Amino acid sequence: MKVREILVTSALPYANGDIHLGHLVEYIQTDIWVRSMKAQGHKVTYVCADDAHGTAIMLKAEDNGVTPEQQIANVQAAHEADFAKFLINFDNYHSTHSEENREFSELIYRRLRDTGHISTRDVEQLFDPEKQLFLADRFVKGTCPECAAPDQYGDNCEVCGTTYDATELKDPYSTLSNATPILKTSKHYFFDLPEFEQFLKDWTRSDNRLQVSVANKLQEWFDAGLTSWDISRDAPYFGFQIPDTPSDEPDKYFYVWLDAPVGYMASFKNLCDKRAGTDDALDFDHYWAQENEHKTEVYHFIGKDIVYFHALFWPAMLAGSELRTPTAVFAHGFLMVNGEKMSKSRGTFIKADTYAEHLHPEYLRYYFASKLSDKVEDINLDLEDFMQKVNSDLVGKVVNIASRSAGFLLKKYDGMLTDVCAEPSLLEDITKTGDEIAAAYENREFSRAMRLIMQCADKANEYIDEKKPWALAKVEGAEQEVQDVCSVAINIFRQLMVYLAPVLPELTANAKEFLNINDLSFASRNEWLLGHQINKFKPLMQRIDEKDVAAMVDASKASLTQVDAPTASQDDKMVAKNTAPAATPSSTEQADYIGIEDFAKVEMKVAHVIACSYVEGADKLLQFTLDVGEAQPRNVFSGIRKFYEPEQLLDKKVICVTNLAPRKMKFGISEGMILSSGDPKTQLTVVTLPDNCVIGDLLA
């Protein structure tokens, strides 16, 4: 077997908050993949870091009365503690606020600049006169310029789905101070992404670099046209200053998304320096130099919401600075809990440390593994199913094999297994299944791997049930058969531990002690324990108690109520502005009426939903393909994602406003608006029509 040299990363958690179960989907997925590849004999290095720059961190530190450096150090310590609880085994964990990251960020920038890929131009932005800083889109709210919905963020409307510039908002206000922002002009630095369009089109479709659905989504962005990427921010900002700026522009900083992916390189370089001169030494250039792209492998595991950065900006930056690009980028979906988005009020927005206080982390590792595939699909943590699956599969099937067999061997045979296997065909069958399991792990088809493993466990339990060693133990002269049956069962249990080791490292470590062995690598699955003595059996896993799950949910409600309570000093103005009741015109006052001729201008048609899907990179939008009775279906974006699963709206008849001017959005062209009712902050309901409504008919 050729030993592959592989570098693996997970997306960098932002140093501004706690790790929760939604984050852990990715880190558990990556850790399982890394452990499985190491178990198969490959040289795999797994690095990560905290994403430690940006305005949000600067403001959070200010709120907490500490320096940004203290803020990110405190958060990083908490992150590393949480990851350790869930057995995430990084080879190195670093920070983007590091000298290595500064060095590589400046190197990439200078190479891009010197080859003509960086330009500057003046940008008009909203500026908070009280805070004395330029406002990022998410720090501005106002009235949507398209549908007039109030309290919408500065980048897109949650009601109608329209994207816009923050300067287009009506009645804007700063979410930081409640002040009315003013317009100011500043020179910004741009990376010329369109210059790399052909390279990116080829790259995204070559060598299985991306999942098919991701490549298809990127094609939509190509069709809409790539735009230059703003890579600069103005002071005050926590991050790295852009080098070599003119003397009249001293306070320009790299935008956080420029140096964040560079953090992968920085963490790896930090590890290379730590290991220099040791037997485990690593050569940075061997993995990142352009000429070594086909000698080593680099894989990024990410969430589907940051595909745009990792599959467009990042490879273009690397190619433009003459560094190697990733071998592949693997995207995953989001976590739902009990079929819905994680909810603070329902106690299903569960922090990592809250979970670990009540339940064993390996329960979650197994459950996630049983749900994860190579697809970009959301997974659902159904708490009832979670309890049943763990108790049934791990306790009732796997651990039960050892517990029901070890007692006979320890009591009557001093823990000795037989010298000859009584059922070689059964063990050979389970050994052969290991090839399928190994392939499933490598292909990130973890749910398939878990199904195959449980099928092996079922065979073992069926064998034990058929042979009934508890009954044989009472039969005079059947001593050898009892030892034979239990020895076969223990050997199957050992094979299952080989297969489950990437998912359940703590369980398998305890199993090694019980089995009196040192090796559970994939290569060892061909080895049988013959004439071997096992140690005393201790319970390896406890059943999940429903009370513990309930306590975890209750604790999540309590802790998040405390964390989310706003302070009066910051939020009173905001609450006053946003919750004051609107004045109601008296009968003698003139309201803002429109004439019938104005309403008649709005064209609304019966539309049939023929396709509905999530929008990569947009956590509020759903994308619809609508038949409105025209020659071609229409593409429409709607900001209702948090209220619906796409499949809930398939084949429905809805109302579409069809004579709105097409709107160019980041994700494509929106050719209409779907009507909904309700409060966009709490619940929107799509207005649906009876089946007997005719597609394309006008509403009047």
From Swiss-Prot:
Name listed for the protein in its UniProt record: Methionine--tRNA ligase
NCBIfam families: metG, metG_C_term, PRK00133.1
Keyword Flavoprotein annotated: no
EC number: 6.1.1.10
PANTHER family: METHIONINE--TRNA LIGASE, METHIONINE--TRNA LIGASE, CYTOPLASMIC
Organism for this UniProt entry: Psychrobacter arcticus (strain DSM 17307 / VKM B-2377 / 273-4)
GO CC annotation: cytosol
Domain tRNA-binding: 598-700
Reaction equations catalysed: tRNA(Met) + L-methionine + ATP = L-methionyl-tRNA(Met) + AMP + diphosphate
Record-linked InterPro entries: aa-tRNA-synth_I_CS, Anticodon_Met, M/V/L/I-tRNA-synth_anticd-bd, Met-tRNA-synth_bsu_C, Met-tRNA_ligase_1, Met-tRNA_synth, Methionyl/Leucyl_tRNA_Synth, MetRS_core
Organism lineage string: Bacteria, Pseudomonadati, Pseudomonadota, Gammaproteobacteria, Moraxellales
Cofactor(s) in the UniProt record: Zn(2+)
Subunit: Homodimer.
Binding site for ATP: K344
This protein's encoding gene: metG
Role this protein plays: Is required not only for elongation of protein synthesis but also for the initiation of all mRNA translation through initiator tRNA(fMet) aminoacylation.
GO molecular function, a single term: ATP binding
Subcellular location: Cytoplasm
Coiled-coil boundaries: none
Cofactor note: Binds 1 zinc ion per subunit.
Short motif 'HIGH' region, span: 13-23
Keywords for this protein: Aminoacyl-tRNA synthetase, ATP-binding, Cytoplasm, Ligase, Metal-binding, Nucleotide-binding, Protein biosynthesis, RNA-binding, tRNA-binding, Zinc
